[in-house]
Amino acid sequence: ELEALLITDNQIQARIDSHNKILYARHADQRNATFQK
């Protein structure tokens, strides 16, 4: 699915709870994430 593709491609910071069908967004440090790209 699109969400899984975006997560594995590091486009969004999140994890998927496949049992409960919930997408948990990680609130990453935006400044740190910017410098890592």
Swiss-Prot record:
Q: Which organism is it from?
A: Brassica oleracea
What binding partners and quaternary form does the record give?
Component of the CSN complex, probably composed of CSN1, CSN2, CSN3, CSN4, CSN5 (CSN5A or CSN5B), CSN6 (CSN6A or CSN6B), CSN7 and CSN8.
What GO cellular component is one of the record's annotations?
Answer: cytoplasm
Its protein name is COP9 signalosome complex subunit 1
**Which keywords appear in this protein's UniProt record, sorted alphabetically?**
Cytoplasm, Developmental protein, Nucleus, Phytochrome signaling pathway, Signalosome
Q: What is the lineage of its organism?
A: Eukaryota, Viridiplantae, Streptophyta, Embryophyta, Tracheophyta
Location(s), subcellular: Cytoplasm; Nucleus
Q: Which GO terms describe its biological process?
A: red, far-red light phototransduction
Which family is annotated? Belongs to the CSN1 family.
Q: State the function annotated in the UniProt record.
A: Component of the COP9 signalosome complex (CSN), a complex involved in various cellular and developmental processes such as photomorphogenesis and auxin and jasmonate responses. The CSN complex is an essential regulator of the ubiquitin (Ubl) conjugation pathway by mediating the deneddylation of the cullin subunits of SCF-type E3 ligase complexes, leading to decrease the Ubl ligase activity of SCF. It is involved in repression of photomorphogenesis in darkness by regulating the activity of COP1-containing Ubl ligase complexes.
